[in-house]
Amino acid sequence: MSSIHCFTSASFAYLDRVRVLGETLKKHHPDWNFWLCLSDQEPDGFSFELDREPIDGIVRIEELGISSLQSWIFEHDVVELCTAVKGQMLVRLLEGGADKVVYLDPDIAVISDLTDIVNWLDDNDILLTPHQLIPDIKRKAIIDNEMASLAYGIYN
């Protein structure tokens, strides 16, 4: 088993994006294990066959060991929920034997090799990529971006 694991966190509404992420990740890193942390259940009548997906494994929110799960879920909207499970999923993969773990948002397409990230993890315990590096100056951008950063943080 590869010691490099990559995961994303999403609901079924984002499954199409997760597929693009998985397909493009596997194109550049076929030896990485790609995981989906799934925050909800399949809709009625939906058929989901893992062996036909570019995903090596799925961990459902119920498998993360979150205490009082139903009340915890109730406190979050779907975006917050997909964000809130990242820490527990990271711990699960590391405790499961992963040497290195990369998280990618589900709406990402990998367009080039990510080996530099893996190499940086040789010397660093964690790497963070902020949503913003340069302050916005236009009013609309400030409202859309700066206010969101104040509300949710630049790392989510």
Question: What label would you give each PLM region?
Answer:
Residues 1-156:
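Glycosyltransferase catalytic domains, chiefly GT-A lineage
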